Amino acid sequence: MLRNPLFPKFKLWFVLSLSIALSWGMSGRAHEVAPTIADFTVDDGTLSMVMRLNAEAFLAGIDLDGLGDTDDTDEGAAYDALRQLDAEGLEARFLPFAADWLARVGVEADGPVTLEITGFDAGEMGDPRFARSSELVVGATLPDGAQEMVLSWPVGAGTLVL
């Protein structure tokens, strides 16, 4: 039986190539842009909204509208640096940012409504191959008798799923 001396080399090359391709695909998940997901409730005239978001992407100043990967932006390096923060470090940086950014989120219910931060959980870093999901909780008192509410999402904030 004849053996091809190139077959073991080809097999090694194939396995290495496959491993590299798979690791590139998995490591990219930390840079894939996901929508902000918000759940809101209104109870006795009080609005509460819980937003699950990528705090590091917002902090880095990335325009998330239509973006698929944070590596495709000039702010990608800043995003990578922010991803290295522990939960306390991210909270210390995000809360002052969020207080200013929240003014750009428009809520109207028989007139403008002012949102206030009522909680923030940076979330644990976990597996660095995946983006961290942080939770921002905001609230507001709605005017008596308000029947409709309109939410305006800021330009550059990416997709919002309610």
Model-found features: residue ranges?
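Bacterial N-terminal signal peptides
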Residues: 13-23
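Membrane-protein biogenesis/insertion across secretory and organellar systems
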Residues: 2, 16-17, 30-32
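Bacterial N-terminal signal peptides that target proteins for export
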Residues: 2-14
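N-terminal signal peptide c-region/cleavage motif recognized by signal peptidases
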Residues: 25-27
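N-terminal soluble domains immediately following signal/targeting peptides that reside
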Residues: 29-162
